């Protein structure tokens, strides 16, 4: 940046005017800095220099905006450019994918294909990563066809993302087939497969694959142990969970939030509440992550343990006093203990919180279109159609119920 400023200010008879290559280099260097401090002023300089339509400079500006989490600015710039190249389209797919905007990443990928651009393994990988996070198996299967069509079946980048997509969507047979077609599987591939089996309740296969991975002389990382501990938690395998926790510590991997989440859940659901409290209190997350205390509280509700449950609720509410889910769990805990006067007080507080709380949104995908709605939503464009369909279904259910009653009475 300093060199660029000196270049601009230099005077050797005529001012030195930076060209598109200079701007591209400077914008790339400034991408790691906050956009407001360096990127946006540089963008203004690009416009002043008359280079705002340069594809070369545009690519670096779009990358800079995505690096700074300014995806909206990246879209505005992209739409304003009269000419685009394959690098720019790939940047739009990858940028939205890495920023968690899966639907937009897929939208730009499809538009890229429609515009006739040839996709590479990187753009395919980014699109597949989006379907994995988006839980879009149908779109993922379509992208699988594109991987085959483009000749990237043996490519570790595309195949690894394809495997991850199938595993996260619970399509374990598809994941299994892809996994064993990859000639040189890296740690990410093994982690995806172990995680897929673990998250969907097949702990036996998860542990078997882990053994194969060790025999292949791959060193497990923190993601591997998240998957293994999650598998133990899902299946209630306490001793196995403790074993993998010990292995993780032996490997010199410090447990993170997700590791503690699985262990607290595992110990809590097994009724080992005191062990769970001890583990949690010794963790670095005890004073800053109320989610862990809520997990413990949920186990206390299931086991009707009032004393540990109250302690867990106090810890969670000390960090997040307005969390409604903690209040609801605490209410259920007191209800199970028959303390209805306390339940009434908590529920009164919950009602007050509901008045102040902004409604959450839900979404559903129907025929490749995302529909967003909330409770008591009167503004949706198809609200009348929805009501009509509900009435039709209600009528069918009532008709079926009356028919069953007639059959029973006649029998």
Task: Give the location of each predicted region.
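Terminal (and in a subset, N-terminal) low-complexity or junction segments at the ends
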Residues: 1-411
């Amino acid at each position: 940046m300093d060199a660029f400023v000196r270049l601009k200010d230099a005077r050797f008879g005529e001012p030195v005017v930076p060209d598109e290559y200079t701007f591209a280099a400077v914008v790339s260097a400034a991408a790691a800095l906050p956009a407001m401090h360096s990127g946006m002023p540089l963008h203004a300089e690009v416009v002043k220099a008359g280079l705002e339509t340069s594809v070369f400079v545009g690519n670096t500006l779009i990358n800079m905006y995505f690096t700074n989490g300014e995806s909206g600015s990246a879209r505005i710039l992209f739409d304003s450019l009269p000419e685009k190249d394959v690098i720019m389209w790939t940047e739009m797919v990858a940028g939205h994918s890495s920023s968690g905007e899966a639907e937009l990443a897929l939208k730009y990928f499809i538009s890229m294909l429609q515009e006739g651009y040839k996709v590479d393994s990187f753009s395919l990988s980014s699109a597949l990563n989006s379907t994995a996070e988006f839980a879009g198996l149908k779109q993922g299967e379509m992208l699988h066809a594109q991987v085959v069509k483009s000749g990237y079946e043996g490519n570790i980048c595309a195949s690894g993302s394809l495997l991850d997509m199938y595993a996260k969507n619970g399509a374990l047979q598809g994941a299994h087939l892809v996994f064993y077609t990859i000639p040189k599987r890296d740690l990410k591939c093994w982690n995806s497969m172990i995680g897929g089996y673990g998250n969907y309740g097949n702990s036996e296969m998860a542990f078997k694959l882990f053994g194969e991975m060790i025999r292949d002389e791959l060193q497990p990382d923190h993601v591997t142990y998240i998957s293994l501990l999650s598998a133990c938690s899902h299946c209630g395998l306490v001793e196995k969970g403790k074993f993998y926790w010990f292995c993780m510590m032996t490997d010199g991997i410090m447990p993170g939030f997700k590791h503690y989440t699985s262990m607290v859940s595992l110990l809590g659901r097994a009724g080992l509440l005191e062990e769970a409290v001890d583990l949690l209190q010794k963790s670095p997350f005890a004073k800053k992550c109320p989610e862990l205390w809520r997990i413990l509280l949920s186990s206390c509700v299931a086991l009707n343990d009032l004393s540990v449950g109250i302690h867990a609720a106090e810890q969670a509410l000390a960090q997040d006093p307005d969390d409604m889910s903690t209040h609801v769990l605490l209410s259920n805990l007191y209800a199970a203990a028959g303390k209805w006067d306390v339940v009434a007080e908590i529920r009164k507080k919950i009602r007050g919180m509901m008045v102040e709380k902004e409604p959450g949104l839900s979404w559903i995908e129907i025929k490749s279109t995302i529909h967003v709605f909330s409770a008591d939503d009167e503004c949706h464009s198809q609200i009348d159609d929805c009501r009509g369909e509900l009435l039709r279904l209600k009528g069918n259910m009532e008709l079926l119920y009356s028919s069953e009653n007639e059959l029973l009475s006649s029998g």
